[in-house]
């Protein structure tokens, strides 16, 4: 935002330099990125009056002009501008003068004719061609009003000024207007802010007799109003208004369009002006666009609309794309006589989506996207009516045609002086605090020690007590607050939360098992968005992704972990063991926030233990990966169970779901050979757990038991079973009949091949028995073992 000091003085008067003002504003939270001085590098620039113009005798494109510059005699200046003519008031750089770019003006002879100065264009005095009125793009600037020759040209152009360039954070949308900035400056200097005149002399004719307004969806358009002005005269706007627009980075067009832009900058409220006679009806209907509906915007581009777009229509045809750009056939033209002025509040999200999709970013859309101050909507329209009456000879119809509700102008927030003082560490009286709020333009109500601050709608960044505390500290002055030690009502020792503690334990376990922690992108390709997803819900896609590889939010951590493993293997790091704790995302219904769930995932490939002098290497397999998962469950004092499963992307015979309290909380398995080959990986094992689900289980206290004083006993059993029977089913049967002396079991061998029928496999299981109260006898163990074997035989197993 570019803030002209000359313009700012219209609302607030301060006795300070612009550089000091910029420094003070920066110290209170709004960064002044640059200070533009239009008088810099300019010297001896005056207003001149062209008394006569004659063709140069030796150059067709040059003219010899006699110019009155306020001295005893006119000076002769040779000028090549095509639009120079007698009777014009122009900008003249006198001999001895200086222009931007180090240009010095000297007496010269041009093709034999003396020239004592230079008639200047706006570009030559430092104005960007982007902001110069089109009528002066290729020639000198000509004043539209009479001037006094010899007076300071910069003053006549309202360019003897310095402009502050604000680098605003998104929360300070109030400073995107001159009035919002004036409130800030008035607060800093404890002075009054004067608002501009908005009162018009209205006709007896009512706008309600000529126009109706209807809103079809007030969720998208809470409020829409219109006023009507008749008999406007289209002509250039006054010099002072053009200068203010140029200094704000906007090109002047004509008085009607310029007034619309002027009020936008003044109030931060975007307006749109329609040619009333071109609308084609006496009704304005604001609705969402029909799918595939088309309209041509002011830039002569035909746009295809979506139902998410908001359009202003004449009851049938769109005449404007709400908050973004007007339509071509209702625009203000040179012949326009009657004007309809729009002031509205549109849904910020809808405007943002439309402007980004169509790549139509403008001063108006950026303000609608940040939210509009309800207190200024009608006031800005009234200001435009006043300016049209004053500078376009307009006749303002009485009454406002509107639909919807503006909403609250203020938001009350209660706070106490004690709360403020405890936070900033400095004692201010209640009266001092109220004074600061009043300086900001906030009304207050006091009830004992409670201050109710009535925050105006222009300050959308203030919603909670802490925001008010920040305002007090800002306006009082951060540099003026003394350094103090913080005061605490209650001092407690710092400690980790239960979740933080458990998370650290899990990381330590996994790192101790040889895994390295990875952190990967939350964004994946649309194809990978649902890969390995445990919920298979609708994906969350970006509207404008930077690349196809980062187009959707992930539903699993594994796609990027597989990519990381492949990346490492391709660079000769063939033994990869990674884990990640991160968020995945699942969409809910339209308009609802998605679910964000924390997952724990891992990937292992290559050798787990490399071949060393003291032992042989150990290659990663299913049981090793399962052992890593079991370490996690043991550390968290949880008991996992496993159930065979078929999961896309994993080996159909080497995959299991992980259950906790009979609920699926994850899975483990070998990466499908095809997928592994696509990523140049050998046998690779992965696991994924719903970490939130693990954290939500209450495990109570860990009970410690003494080391057994009596010896245990082990028995091995080999079972021939159908190859499709999971070992887990056999273990379940064993534990069901093992009584209280069977402590644990271990599958230590699985065999398929010679000496076995086709479709059969042999599973060897070790059974460990223990009685903590007495020594086990062989007879007692044999009895339990026999019961187990009988149950297994009944299940279809053959004891080998």
Swiss-Prot record:
Catalytic class of the enzyme: ligase
Gene name in the database record: pheT
InterPro entries on file: aa-tRNA-synth_II/BPL/LPL, B3/B4_tRNA-bd, DNA-bd_dom_put_sf, Fdx_antiC-bd, Fdx_antiC-bd_sf, NA-bd_OB-fold, Phe-tRNA-ligase_IIc_bsu, Phe-tRNA-ligase_IIc_bsu_bact
Catalytic activity: tRNA(Phe) + L-phenylalanine + ATP = L-phenylalanyl-tRNA(Phe) + AMP + diphosphate + H(+)
Domain FDX-ACB per the UniProt entry, residue ranges: 708-800
Source taxon at top rank: Bacteria
Cofactors, names only: Mg(2+)
Name the UniProt record assigns to this protein: Phenylalanine--tRNA ligase beta subunit
């Amino acid at each position: 935002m570019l803030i002209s000091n000359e313009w700012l003085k219209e609302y607030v008067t301060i006795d300070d330099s612009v550089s000091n003002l910029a420094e003070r504003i920066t110290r209170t939270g709004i960064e002044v990125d640059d200070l533009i001085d239009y008088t810099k590098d300019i010297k001896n620039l005056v207003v001149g009056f062209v008394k006569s113009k004659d063709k140069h005798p030796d150059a067709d494109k040059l003219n010899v002009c006699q110019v009155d510059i306020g001295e005893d005699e006119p000076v002769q200046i040779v000028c090549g501008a095509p639009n120079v003519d007698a009777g014009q008031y122009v900008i003249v750089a006198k001999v001895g003068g200086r222009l931007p770019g180090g240009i010095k003006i000297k007496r010269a002879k041009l093709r034999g004719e003396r020239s004592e100065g230079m008639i200047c264009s706006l570009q030559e005095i430092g104005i960007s061609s982007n902001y110069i009125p089109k009528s002066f793009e290729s020639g000198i600037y000509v004043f539209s009003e009479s001037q006094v020759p010899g007076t300071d040209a910069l003053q006549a152009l309202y360019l003897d000024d310095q402009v502050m360039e604000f680098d605003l954070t998104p929360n300070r949308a109030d400073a995107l207007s001159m009035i919002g900035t004036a409130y800030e400056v008035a607060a800093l200097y404890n002075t009054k802010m004067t608002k501009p005149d908005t009162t018009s002399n209205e006709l007896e004719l009512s706008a309600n007799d000529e126009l109706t307004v209807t809103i079809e969806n007030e969720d998208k358009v809470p409020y829409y109003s219109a006023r009507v002005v008749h008999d406007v005269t289209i002509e250039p706007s006054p010099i002072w208004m053009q200068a203010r627009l140029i200094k704000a980075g906007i090109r002047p067009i004509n008085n009607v369009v310029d007034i619309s832009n002027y009020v936008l900058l003044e109030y931060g409220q975007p307006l749109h002006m329609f040619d009333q006679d071109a609308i084609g009806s006496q009704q304005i209907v604001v609705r969402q666009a029909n799918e595939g509906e088309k309209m041509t915007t002011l830039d002569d581009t035909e746009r295809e609309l979506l139902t998410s777009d908001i359009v202003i229509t004449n009851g049938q045809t769109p005449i404007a794309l709400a908050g973004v750009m007007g339509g071509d056939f209702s625009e203000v033209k040179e012949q326009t006589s009657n004007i309809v002025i729009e002031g509205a509040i549109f849904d910020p999200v809808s405007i943002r989506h439309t402007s980004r999709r169509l790549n139509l970013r403008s001063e108006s859309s950026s303000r609608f996207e940040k939210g509009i101050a309800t207190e200024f909507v009608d006031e800005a329209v009234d200001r435009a009516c006043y300016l049209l009456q004053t500078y376009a000879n307009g006749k303002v119809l009485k009454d406002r045609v509107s639909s919807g509700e503006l909403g609250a102008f203020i938001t009350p927030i209660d706070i106490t002086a004690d709360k403020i003082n405890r936070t900033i560490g400095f004692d201010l009286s209640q009266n001092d605090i109220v004074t600061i709020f009043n300086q900001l333009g906030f009304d207050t109500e006091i009830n004992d020690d409670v201050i109710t601050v009535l925050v105006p709608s222009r300050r959308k960044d203030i919603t909670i007590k802490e925001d008010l505390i920040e305002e007090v500290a800002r306006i009082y002055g951060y540099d003026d607050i003394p350094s103090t030690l913080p005061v605490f009502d209650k001092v407690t020792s710092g400690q980790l939360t239960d979740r933080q503690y458990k998370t650290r334990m899990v990381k330590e376990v996994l790192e101790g098992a040889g895994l390295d922690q990875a952190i990967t992108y939350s964004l994946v390709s649309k194809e990978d968005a649902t890969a390995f997803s445990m919920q298979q819900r609708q994906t969350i896609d970006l509207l404008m992704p930077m690349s196809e590889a980062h187009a959707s939010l992930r539903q699993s951590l594994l796609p990027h972990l597989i990519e990381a493993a492949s990346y490492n293997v391709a660079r000769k790091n063939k033994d990869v063991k990674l884990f990640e704790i991160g968020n995945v995302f699942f969409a809910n219904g339209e308009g609802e926030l998605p679910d964000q769930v924390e997952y724990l995932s891992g990937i292992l490939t290559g050798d787990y233990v490399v071949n060393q002098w003291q032992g042989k290497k150990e290659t990663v397999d299913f049981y090793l990966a399962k052992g890593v998962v079991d370490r996690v469950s043991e550390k968290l004092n949880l008991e996992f169970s496993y159930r065979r499963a078929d999961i896309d992307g994993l080996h159909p015979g080497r995959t299991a779901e992980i259950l906790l309290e009979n609920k699926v909380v994850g899975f483990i398995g070998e990466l499908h050979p095809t997928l592994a080959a696509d990523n140049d990986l050998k046998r690779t094992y992965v696991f994924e757990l719903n970490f939130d689900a693990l954290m939500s289980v209450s495990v109570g206290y860990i009970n410690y038991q003494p080391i057994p004083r009596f010896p245990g006993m082990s028995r091995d059993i080999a079972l021939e079973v159908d190859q499709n029977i999971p070992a887990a089913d056999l273990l379940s049967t064993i534990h069901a009949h093992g009584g209280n002396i069977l402590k644990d079991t271990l599958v230590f061998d699985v065999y398929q091949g010679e000496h076995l029928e086709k479709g059969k496999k042999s599973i060897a299981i070790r059974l460990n028995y223990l009685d903590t109260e007495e020594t086990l006898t062989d007879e007692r163990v044999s009895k339990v073992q026999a019961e187990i074997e009988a149950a297994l035989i009944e299940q279809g197993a053959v004891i080998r």
